[in-house]
């Protein structure tokens, strides 16, 4: 049984798992959809025909996606849940600043303007929501620490410069099994850090990163690389001797390129 790896395919996989003589395959929806889009007609019937064609012509090894275990899915969803809470905390902080910005201290008299009851209510409500969000983030991080306490892989990931408890937890459960990657280039491409390439005849041009795969993991890797650039700049020359020259590091665009290269 084959289906596109779209939203909601995990329950189907779990339901078919106990059945004997049944093989379930989830195919990359981005690639199968691109095949159907070339005809200009996108229907469920055409999608089913494309999936059948892929299976009959031996395209399963090329288009099949990894099927993570239930525990790995739940752990990575916890990392996604924490990320959403962090974004919510940022929005609340911005809202508090927007409300209180007009009630700053007078630079000439040193007096603070009196806030109305409405503004006081909004500020208190936002601060209460912010405090509650902080507690939720703390609970999520406690769960992550508890789940990673007995895992042998997470401490090894944290030995990498720039990788902390949050990065290592997300990496651990998104990768799950490192043996499914042939080399580091395939792992980098899995997280969208591979280089775009365009070749036609004798021309071959490389561009930016592909930005496919997990956005969260790619963001955490870039943040870890930024932390390493800020706290351990002397280590950059170990990875990129020419790019990390002192004169080049003055260019912000150049520094951003080094950060992405370090994340790869």
What annotation goes with each model-predicted range?
Residues 11-15, 95:
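Phosphate- and divalent-cation-binding pockets in alpha/beta enzyme and binding domains
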Residues 46, 52-70, 219-233:
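Metal-dependent DNA phosphodiester-chemistry modules and their immediately adjacent helices/loops
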Residues 77-156:
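Glycine-rich, often acidic, oxyanion-interacting loops/wings at catalytic, nucleic-acid
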Residues 156-159, 165, 169-258:
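Phosphate-backbone recognition surface of nucleic-acid-processing proteins
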Residues 17, 24-65, 114, 201-212:
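Short alpha-helix plus adjacent loop in nuclease-associated cores
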Residues 52-79, 110-120:
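A short, charged helix-loop
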Residues 2-12:
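Acidic, metal-coordinating catalytic cores used for nucleic-acid/nucleotide bond scission
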């Amino acid at each position: 049984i084959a289906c596109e790896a779209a939203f909601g395919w995990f329950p189907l996989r779990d339901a078919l798992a106990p059945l004997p003589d049944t093989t379930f395959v989830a195919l990359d929806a981005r690639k199968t959809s691109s095949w159907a889009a070339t005809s200009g007609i996108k229907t469920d019937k055409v999608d089913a025909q494309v999936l059948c064609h892929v299976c009959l012509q031996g395209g399963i090894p090329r288009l099949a996606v990894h099927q993570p275990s239930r525990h790995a899915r739940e752990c990575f969803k916890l990392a996604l849940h924490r990320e959403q809470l962090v974004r919510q905390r940022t929005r609340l902080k911005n809202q508090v600043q927007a409300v209180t910005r007009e009630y700053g201290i007078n630079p000439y008299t040193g007096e603070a303007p009196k806030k109305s009851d409405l503004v006081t209510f909004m500020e208190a409500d936002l601060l209460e929501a912010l405090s509650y969000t902080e507690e939720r983030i703390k609970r999520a991080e406690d769960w992550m620490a508890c789940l990673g306490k007995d895992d042998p892989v997470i401490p090894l990931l944290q030995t990498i410069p720039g990788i902390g408890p949050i990065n290592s937890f997300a990496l651990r459960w998104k990768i799950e099994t490192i043996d499914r990657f042939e080399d580091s280039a395939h792992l980098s491409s899995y997280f969208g850090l591979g280089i775009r390439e365009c070749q036609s005849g004798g021309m071959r041009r490389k561009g930016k990163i592909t930005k496919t795969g997990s956005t969260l993991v790619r963001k955490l890797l870039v943040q870890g690389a930024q932390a390493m650039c800020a706290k351990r700049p002397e280590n950059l020359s170990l990875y990129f001797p020419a790019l990390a020259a002192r004169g080049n590091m003055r260019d912000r665009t150049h520094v951003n390129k080094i950060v992405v290269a370090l994340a790869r």
